Design a protein with these regions (language model features):
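A basic, amphipathic helix-loop patch mediating RNA/tRNA/ribosome contacts
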Residues: 1-50, 84-85
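Glycine-rich helix-loop-beta junction characteristic of Rossmann-like nucleotide cofactor-binding loops
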Residues: 16, 74-81, 143-144
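Conserved SAM-binding loop of SAM-dependent methyltransferases across substrates and taxa
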Residues: 92-103
């Protein structure tokens, strides 16, 4: 075996993970130890001869995305029992899985890609798999059920382009938990090597713009926190909690939130 083999591939080859995607999720969640030392980067190589073990709880969802929605549900007053939901940017389906495990009656799993949704979810009668579908142009004809809840985890596009269509799909009082990704919200000149945004000042600007875009699209912003895990390249990301309602916005101390996120998720 080549000593250049990536850690995520090693986990799969050694039977420690069902698939490479699940291996990446377990590694990035901090559960993988090589020769007794935690390694949290899936692309780490040069470990072929070292003992590898997975410690602690295995990932409860088909991907680590479920951990992000799990935190949103613990932080904000979100309950999904018997709710009609949408997972925008479903990919493997971590958010969808989390919704189902929390009692969702039906989930529309929407992604512009194809063939990514985990088979467990694809074959679940509560899931409507909507592949090759650009959420920016979703219509009530495609999702005829008024949505109680939607999650958004999209890449290479700003949330402000998703909000208008989603507003028309949510019932009055419907809620959103969305992932705010600085690498796709900041201007190109503010994005560093490998697409990583490290500057706390830029993070604060991104959150301020998020608040503006949400309000311009008639959503009430009731909460913001940081994601419990970094993005694939190491980006700190944030979670927003929105509602289609006439309630007043919450009050947010963005500098403190950004400082806390950098302290808790430091390299």
């Amino acid at each position: 075996m080549s000593n250049k083999t990536r850690l995520d591939i090693l986990l799969t080859e050694r039977g420690l993970a069902e698939s490479r995607q699940k291996a990446q999720a377990v590694i990035m969640a901090g559960h993988v130890f090589v020769a007794g030392q935690r390694v949290d980067k899936p692309g780490t190589a040069g470990l072929s001869d070292a003992p590898i073990e997975v410690r602690g709880h295995t990932l409860p969802y088909v991907s680590r995305g479920g951990l992000k929605l799990e935190k949103a549900m613990k932080t904000f007053p979100i309950t999904l029992t018997d709710k009609i939901c949408a997972d925008i940017g479903a990919s493997t389906g971590g958010f969808t899985d989390c919704m189902l495990q929390n009692g969702a009656r039906k989930v529309y799993s929407v992604d512009v890609g194809y063939g990514q949704l985990d088979w467990k979810l694809r074959s679940d009668p509560r899931v409507v798999c909507m592949e090759r579908t650009n959420a920016r142009y979703l219509t009530p004809e495609q999702i005829p059920d008024p949505l109680d809840f939607a999650s958004i985890d999209v890449s290479f596009i700003s949330l402000k382009l998703i909000f208008p269509a989603l507003y028309g799909l949510l019932r009055q009082g419907g809620e959103i938990a969305c992932l705010i990704k600085p690498q796709f919200e900041a201007g190109r000149e503010k994005v560093g090597k490998k697409g990583v945004v490290r500057d706390p000042t830029v993070h604060q600007e991104v959150l301020e713009h998020f608040l503006t875009h949400a309000r311009e699209n008639h959503f009430t912003v009731l909460g913001i926190t940081y994601s419990p895990i970094r993005g694939p390249e190491g980006n700190i990301e944030y979670l927003g909690y929105l509602k289609k309602c006439d309630e007043p916005d919450g009050s947010f101390d963005l500098p403190t939130l950004v400082a806390e996120s950098h302290s808790q998720l430091k390299d």
